[in-house]
């Protein structure tokens, strides 16, 4: 692939998905896009670039290129700490604040193959009677149609269920299907999957009490990070929560959120109305059901 072709691809990916591809990642583009070129009967990435130049913005080949370059790695209860925050801080605070309306909305902004929202759903299931009469909605979005199809099916191979999933949860919430495992219908039914590009307007999704936006911002340039964070803030109430990845922060990007003291990766809207839940009032529930 020529430097000019690679520059074109970098610009296309940035415009359509926000993904910033550094110059040293040409090898990654070649390995992921050659199968796309072959699928369309093209003999080289140069031919793929020419096809992209001639295609309309919404042409399927452009969508396939973006999906091929999007990082889709995910696993159950990834990094553990965010799910500890969910258990020990976020849910107790939201259940106290929403005791009257008994409704909580959660958004996983880049759900990939579904392990993150399903991990949250399994965590909610373990609360049991404490959530009786509550409506807890989990909306999970991703830019890729392909990974969303896998997420909706909820079928994972042996390697995938061994990455982070406690054996107790595997036994309780999964059924073996051949050599794979399918998550139980009751868990799948707790998650709504939708296709969404975070660069596009997402105001129509409504307000969310909790937003998981992990390992997404690291692929964006600073301008896009600021834009996404500020728009997320407009989708959240004053007492909402934002969870970012371990390598991500709002510091130096926006004043719409502030870090929650002693809660790594957890942020709250920048308003005096938000206070940490006292430890004595924390509701405990075990993620390892």
What is each PLM-predicted segment?
Residues 109, 129-212, 216-227, 249-251:
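Extended basic-aromatic, gly/pro-enriched interface segments that bind polyanionic ligands
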Residues 238-246:
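Conserved beta-strand signature within the Rossmann-like core of class I S-adenosyl-L-methionine
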Residues 1-107:
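Conserved AdoMet
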Residues 87, 121-125, 233:
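A structural alpha-helix within SAM-dependent methyltransferase catalytic domains
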Residues 210, 253-289:
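Core SAM-dependent methyltransferase catalytic element
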